[in-house]
Amino acid sequence: MARPGQRWLSKWLVAMVVLTLCRLATPLAKNLEPVSWSSLNPKFLSGKGLVIYPKIGDKLDIICPRAEAGRPYEYYKLYLVRPEQAAACSTVLDPNVLVTCNKPHQEIRFTIKFQEFSPNYMGLEFKKYHDYYITSTSNGSLEGLENREGGVCRTRTMKIVMKVGQDPNAVTPEQLTTSRPSKESDNTVKTATQAPGRGSQGDSDGKHETVNQEEKSGPGAGGGGSGDSDSFFNSKVALFAAVGAGCVIFLLIIIFLTVLLLKLRKRHRKHTQQRAAALSLSTLASPKGGSGTAGTEPSDIIIPLRTTENNYCPHYEKVSGDYGHPVYIVQEMPPQSPANIYYKV
């Protein structure tokens, strides 16, 4: 049987291997800058909203700030909508409510984790090279909290465009002139396509890249749909391949540790048997009678369980300790006729 120290070492090795595999399989995630959902937030640019480029594994916090002194509290209900809903500022059909900002004296924080597969049935799932939209059709007042048309989406362009897994520096100028604005693109795309010759000025203003990314996601592009499906398929294949490789490595390590423990156990058992065989009954036997024990029979030869320190046998002491009582091994002697026999006449 494996010793407790060996058992603890094997468990520690397995835990370290599992932790290492999890660290290798998990991409380098980061927490994006939180977004305060307020009409005073300057990040919501007119006609464009807020465009971010998260990667799989990143986290984004949307904060409903608490009421400030001297200003009325802004009531909002945030939705995850489709591109056409974001363009029309309408949440009438199939609304997906994310969070409701309706507690003036409390800061509400809603965290979005960009993951391709969610362990929760109601969790959000995102795909690479796809665009997702968050907006609100509330007007900021308590009476307009349940509005499904217009609201701050239309008046202040309060929307978040999330371009998952895309590169903000990837520029494709050809799409500005050949592609047609679709419902998935917002007002910035329409403005850019009206003046395609101002490409250099768009670069200097820092808006050119955002336009290209939004135009890239629209179905008007020639091979956009097939490219998205191919990239999604490739990402799924890569993910399953990584998971499969990790499982194979984990199984190989488990098999190696099992074989190692069996070898150690076999070696320990063989060593114990060799030491037990070396201790013969002749070397362990010691007569019970002695100088101070008169009247004892010579046949009562007692073999002590624990001999000298060099000939100590751990197996016999373990058995004796398990059963709780000392065990004596008595050598059998042939019966002898008594020396003194008296006959009554």
Curated annotation (Swiss-Prot):
InterPro entries: Cupredoxin, Ephrin, Ephrin-B_Ecto, Ephrin_CS, Ephrin_RBD. A motif (Nuclear localization signal) lies at residues 259-272. Residues 25-236 are extracellular. The modification Phosphoserine is found at S280, S286. Keywords: Cell membrane, Developmental protein, Differentiation, Disulfide bond, Glycoprotein, Membrane, Neurogenesis, Nucleus, Phosphoprotein, Signal, Transmembrane, Transmembrane helix. Its main location: membrane. SUPFAM superfamilies: Cupredoxins (SSF49503). Expressed on lateral floor plate cells, specifically on commissural axon segments that have passed through the floor plate. Expressed in cells of the retinal ganglion cell layer during retinal axon guidance to the optic disk. Expressed in myogenic progenitor cells. Residues 169-227 are annotated as: Disordered. Inducible phosphorylation of tyrosine residues in the cytoplasmic domain. It is found in: Cell membrane; Membrane raft. It is a single-pass type I membrane protein. The chain crosses the membrane at residues 237-257. Residues 30-164 form the Ephrin RBD domain. Pfam families: Ephrin. One of its GO terms (biological process) is ephrin receptor signaling pathway. GO terms for cellular component: cell surface; cytoplasm; membrane raft; nucleus; plasma membrane. Glycans are attached at N139. The keyword Disulfide bond applies. Residues 258-345 are cytoplasmic. Disulfide bonds join C64-C101, C89-C153. PANTHER family: EPHRIN, EPHRIN-B1. Cell surface transmembrane ligand for Eph receptors, a family of receptor tyrosine kinases which are crucial for migration, repulsion and adhesion during neuronal, vascular and epithelial development. Binding to Eph receptors residing on adjacent cells leads to contact-dependent bidirectional signaling into neighboring cells. Shows high affinity for the receptor tyrosine kinase EPHB1/ELK. Can also bind EPHB2 and EPHB3. Binds to, and induces the collapse of, commissural axons/growth cones in vitro. May play a role in constraining the orientation of longitudinally projecting axons. Belongs to the ephrin family. Interacts (via PDZ-binding motif) with GRIP1 and GRIP2 (via PDZ domain 6). Interacts with TLE1. The intracellular domain peptide interacts with ZHX2; the interaction enhances ZHX2 transcriptional repression activity. This is Ephrin-B1. It comes from Mus musculus.
